[in-house]
Amino acid sequence: RPPRSTLFPYTTLFRSNAKKAIVVKFRKNDANGWEDGQTGNYTGTGYLNKKFVHPAFQNGPVHYPYPVIRMAEMYLNLAEILIELDALENTTGRLEEAKGLIDKIRVRAGIPTIDEAWKKANHPEKANTAEGLREIVRRERQIEFYLENQRFWDLRRWKDAGILGEKVWGMNIEGDTDETFFVPTELQNIRTFKQAQYLMPIPMTETNKVPHIVQNPGY
């Protein structure tokens, strides 16, 4: 496993990683009906988001520019295209070009390149196949675009959104010490994902205009 986890403290807040005390109010899955209303001064998973949270945040609105598209996205988009083209046509050079693009992101983050990291992995050959690089670039997208509204669409176009119906794990928020807090704990919420959710429903206002439009399955 590459050491990308070293970036975790910079994007996520957790016990022993806090820099200052701020009292905030939380809501826990109120939109899903699991527990409506405020839940007090705690987080259900033991984690808090740190990325995009302004250092001056004090429970009031803070305005600052939000990137619509970043250079990192263009690099990873092109890398993904090259990997899929190689899988279809099995040509030379595309995988190396894709790795070079991904490495731009990794080097900027201060972590080893793909080849350097996977030399120490259990399956070093993974970085030299289209199938292996596909998994690598998808993982890079998940980490690089954390909370940037990419994951929702990525999982659907990859047809991997079924993982959204799997169990969710967090820390033991009732733990009083590091030993009892840092224990993987299954959250008591039920998530489901249906095949129909790969497509959006066509608004009734549109189907009423054109009766011949066939509604997407499941809606």
What are these regions (language model features)?
Residues R1, P9-Y219:
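Acidic/polar-rich alpha-helix caps and helix-coil junctions
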